[in-house]
Amino acid sequence: MLVTAYLAFVGLLASCLGLELSRCRAKPPGRACSNPSFLRFQLDFYQVYFLALAADWLQAPYLYKLYQHYYFLEGQIAILYVCGLASTVLFGLVASSLVDWLGRKNSCVLFSLTYSLCCLTKLSQDYFVLLVGRALGGLSTALLFSAFEAWYIHEHVERHDFPAEWIPATFARAAFWNHVLAVVAGVAAEAVASWIGLGPVAPFVAAIPLLALAGALALRNWGENYDRQRAFSRTCAGGLRCLLSDRRVLLLGTIQALFESVIFIFVFLWTPVLDPHGAPLGIIFSSFMAASLLGSSLYRIATSKRYHLQPMHLLSLAVLIVVFSLFMLTFSTSPGQESPVESFIAFLLIELACGLYFPSMSFLRRKVIPETEQAGVLNWFRVPLHSLACLGLLVLHDSDRKTGTRNMFSICSAVMVMALLAVVGLFTVVRHDAELRVPSPTEEPYAPEL
């Protein structure tokens, strides 16, 4: 398993590098890329945002392993994950209103503080302290995926008066470097935890200086901005009306809830499936992120002028790949007949599918959901998404360890078949909808929501 992990990592990294180099040679420079003021503004944003992302990714490979290291049972670990998911959905519902009320810069600084506290709780072996840490992690995640983007968009348009058409360029570049940071973070986590031998808590301690630096740079370099608050009840009511009045929105929300709930369960299960076979968790995680980056690169190539595939086609392909991968996992995790290499390949295919799924979903969501109602509609998407994931983890918590993992993958397979049926329904509804087609080469940003 050790050799397989390193070979896969090197191979995926080489593939990604080759695709990105060919894309960069073929892509003409844009006007925004040569504007010195815009580049300075981008740099001020990236310095803080990339530090925050790096700190987040650094913790991912060893979270489950840390709880195992503290001798918690799988059911207890499942409850910790459920607590994190529940806090994410609760804080996510009010994150936009909270950010508007506190101010975007203040919210980014608050993120640095709460996430640092979350990391500090990992030093404790007390179960209640770890539950509090998971709740803080949920708040931090909600702030990470709302405050930073809101601050940038307001500053870009209102303070600097740059063209709104340049905003996607910033987030497309951020999406690429987010993947790169995730790959590097996995290797760094492996280095401090395993190579140096500091143990599974080391990546969490290493994340704290990055978070402190991100908060300090935001305080020093960023201006504050606020926005007019819209009542939370009005936001949700408007989102519900949009959801019920447009079948496309309802089907898209169903696909998102089913697909991403399965991905949340995958995040929980990959460590207990591979770790008993001596897998280097940091390198495994970096391989996952490289596979996702490869999928994102393939999305850009597929939607280019040369191939001109549509996001709807790639969304269908992503769901099909995950269905196939989950069927593989139901066999590779059979008690007494485990095949870790086959499971690893299936996990890589799931991550590749994520690289196709997220930019496709992002494109379709922006086209289908009115901009004024996106926050409200997304709130309604999050509730079933996280509820399904929590339910799945609780089912695993109550099952026998030897058969529970395989049963969970079987359930996930059934869920993804339902998602595939929803994709077929959406495809039937939108097949003649020109609005959902890419008319020219596009560079859709990938914004990971897990």
From Swiss-Prot:
It is found in: Cell membrane. Expressed ubiquitously but at relatively higher levels in the olfactory bulb and the skeletal muscle. The chain crosses the membrane at residues 1-21, 43-63, 79-99, 128-148, 174-194, 195-215, 249-269, 278-298, 311-331, 344-364, 376-396, 409-429. Keywords: Cell membrane, Ion transport, Membrane, Transmembrane, Transmembrane helix, Transport. Gene3D superfamilies: MFS general substrate transporter like domains (1.20.1250.20). GO terms for biological process: molybdate ion transport; monoatomic ion transport. Mediates high-affinity intracellular uptake of the rare oligo-element molybdenum. It holds the Pfam family MFS_5. Coiled coil: none annotated. It is a multi-pass membrane protein. This is Molybdate-anion transporter. GO terms for cellular component: membrane; plasma membrane. Belongs to the major facilitator superfamily. GO terms for molecular function: molybdate ion transmembrane transporter activity.
